[in-house]
Amino acid sequence: MAELITVARPYAEAVYSLATEQGKLDQWSDALSWLAAMVNNPDLAQVVTNPKHTAQEVEALMLDVLGSRGNDDVKRFIAALIENARLTLLPEIAAQFELLKAQSENIVDALVESAFALSDEQKAELTNTLSKKYGKAVRLDVRENADLIGGVRVSVGDDVIDASVRGKLQAMAASLKN
C-alpha cells in the first residue's frame, strides 16, 4: 500500500498543480473519479490491461467512456499513464488528488465507525467536535460496524480515536496481560 502511494503521489501532485493553475479542480476531480472507477470495474480493467490492445485503443476507449470529461490535458495524462504502465494506479492517484484538494479547501475527512446507526443530531455533534479539534471543516463518512459492540471509532488521517466497547475491552485485556 505504501508503495502505491509513493508511486501515485507525484502523478496526483502534477495533476493537482495543473488543475489549480487552470482553476479546474472540480473537473479534474470528476475525471479522475471516472478513470478510477473504470480501472476498478473488472470488465473494463480486463480490456485496459490486456496486452493485445494497443495504447491508442486503450486511450480511445477510456476517452470514449469519459465523454465530455476528457479534454486534451486528460488525454495527455492517460497517454502518460499508459506509456509508463501506470493505469492501475488510477484509484490511488484519484485518492491522493482528493487529499490534496481537501487540504487546499481546509477540509479533513473523518471515517466514523459506529456499532449502531447515528442520528443526524449525533453526526452534527461529531462534526462540530472534530471541527474544533482539527480547526478544519469535517467531511464525515459514517459506517456501521457491529464488531465494535457499542460506541464509535473515529479515524482522521493517522489519528484514531477509539471510544468503542471493543476497544476498551482490548485495552483492558492488554493491561491484564502485563
UniProtKB/Swiss-Prot annotation:
What Pfam families has UniProt attached to this entry?
OSCP
Could you cite one Gene Ontology molecular function of this protein? Answer: proton-transporting ATP synthase activity, rotational mechanism
Q: What is the first-listed, main subcellular location in coarse terms?
A: membrane
The yes or no answer to whether the keyword Ion transport is present is: yes
Q: Which residues form the signal peptide?
A: none
**UniProt KW keywords:** ATP synthesis, Cell inner membrane, Cell membrane, CF(1), Hydrogen ion transport, Ion transport, Membrane, Transport
Keyword Ion transport applies: yes
The cellular component terms of Gene Ontology attached to this UniProt record, alphabetical and capped at eight, are: plasma membrane; proton-transporting ATP synthase complex
Bilayer topology term = Peripheral membrane protein
Location(s) in or outside the cell: Cell inner membrane
- What is the protein's known function? F(1)F(0) ATP synthase produces ATP from ADP in the presence of a proton or sodium gradient. F-type ATPases consist of two structural domains, F(1) containing the extramembraneous catalytic core and F(0) containing the membrane proton channel, linked together by a central stalk and a peripheral stalk. During catalysis, ATP synthesis in the catalytic domain of F(1) is coupled via a rotary mechanism of the central stalk subunits to proton translocation.
* Family, per entry: Belongs to the ATPase delta chain family.
HAMAP family, per database record: ATP_synth_delta_bact (MF_01416)
Quaternary state and interactors: F-type ATPases have 2 components, F(1) - the catalytic core - and F(0) - the membrane proton channel. F(1) has five subunits: alpha(3), beta(3), gamma(1), delta(1), epsilon(1). F(0) has three main subunits: a(1), b(2) and c(10-14). The alpha and beta chains form an alternating ring which encloses part of the gamma chain. F(1) is attached to F(0) by a central stalk formed by the gamma and epsilon chains, while a peripheral stalk is formed by the delta and b chains.
This protein's name:
ATP synthase subunit delta
**Which species?**
Chromobacterium violaceum (strain ATCC 12472 / DSM 30191 / JCM 1249 / CCUG 213 / NBRC 12614 / NCIMB 9131 / NCTC 9757 / MK)
